[in-house]
Amino acid sequence: MTALLRNECKQALAKSLPWTKSPLVISAPMRVMTGPGLAVAVSSAGGLGFLGPTLKPEDVFADLDKAAELLGSSPIQGAAGPSLLPIGVGFQTWNGDLEVAVSAVTKHRPCAVWLFAPRRGQAELNEWTAAIRSASPDTRVWLQVGSLGEAVEAAASATPPDVLVLQGAEGGGHGRHRDAQGTIALVPEVSDALGHSGIPLVAAGGIVDGRGAAAALTLGAAGVAMGTRFLASSEARISKGYQDEVVRASDGAKNTVRTQLYNHLRGTFGWPEPFSPRTLINRSWRDHEAGVEFDRLKELHDESAKTGDAGWGPEGRLATYVGAAVGLVRRVDDAAVIVRETRDQARAILTSVVAHL
């Protein structure tokens, strides 16, 4: 993809999100943890906030209702228009309910829908994309992928996405555990491979501040999506024990692992084979590595869950899903502060680099 086409893609994305400021900062749709308060706060600060998938598919209605209420009391100047909510909503397609999703999108018309994790590959994504576009033609469909092959297949499909989110191996969300590629290699390789497709690219995975954002922009991204950094926001819908761990942790390469263990301990089974999440290592993982049987691990996990915030931490047993860059997250801030600081730092870095060439 040429520099001229990359700029055209950025401009097209910005035009579809007229209230946003450049560079575009996005809060990723983390399951349950990114609720209405966080999504609206990010969009209100000139970014794009996404609601995460909900525990039950039908719970998305309550989240969208609340987001609409918040936006009604504090409208965002320059929003996409009266017919579109200036937030997005994410769906895991493998265990999502397409009928519920279509109903929710029809009612609230979010500006974007983020699709991820199909069980049946691109065919499943084609079904969801076509249904979403039929329900709300002005809603943009974002598709998260983690490999070059997925990106090329999506771009050449019968229903190519409006935006491709490229999740590098550093990400904390469920990503490809066997053929994942780091963000710094994935973004430019996809950009080159797609050539003149005209699909804007959003970088995700390992980005928690303006330094990562600046790097992603130079690689060809039109914006950046952050998950772990927004876990340390005052609006995040998570327990204090979880959030304390996000701020405390360091050395993500050493202290995190990709595994389905914590999903299973929490009673979540059935994720498609290519995917696994990244979590902080604690007693559950160390005991698993030592050969403790799953049934015993489950008992200890469930006992730990009854202790509240003490269930997290190096000696805890509960899941703390984070990205490899967790060591760069050092404090809790309001979401608006995170958006502004990331944007301003990225601008300053890029300006400085150009000035010194």
From Swiss-Prot:
UniProt GO MF annotations: nitronate monooxygenase activity; nucleotide binding
Coiled coil: none
Cofactor note as given: Binds 1 FMN per subunit.
Enzyme class name: oxidoreductase
GO biological process: response to toxic substance
Necessary cofactors: FMN
Keywords on record: Detoxification, Flavoprotein, FMN, Monooxygenase, Nucleotide-binding, Oxidoreductase
Annotated InterPro entries: Aldolase_TIM, NMO
Annotated binding of FMN, by residue: 167, 172, 206
UniProt-listed Enzyme Commission number(s): 1.13.12.-
Homology family: Belongs to the nitronate monooxygenase family. NMO class I subfamily.
Function: Nitronate monooxygenase; part of the gene cluster that mediates the biosynthesis of the deadly neurotoxic nitroalkane 3-nitropropanoic acid (3-NPA) that acts as an antimetabolite of succinate and irreversibly inhibits succinate dehydrogenase and disrupts mitochondrial oxidative phosphorylation. Catalyzes the oxidation of 3-NPA to nitrite and malonic semialdehyde.
Protein name: Nitronate monooxygenase npaC
Native organism: Metarhizium robertsii (strain ARSEF 23 / ATCC MYA-3075)
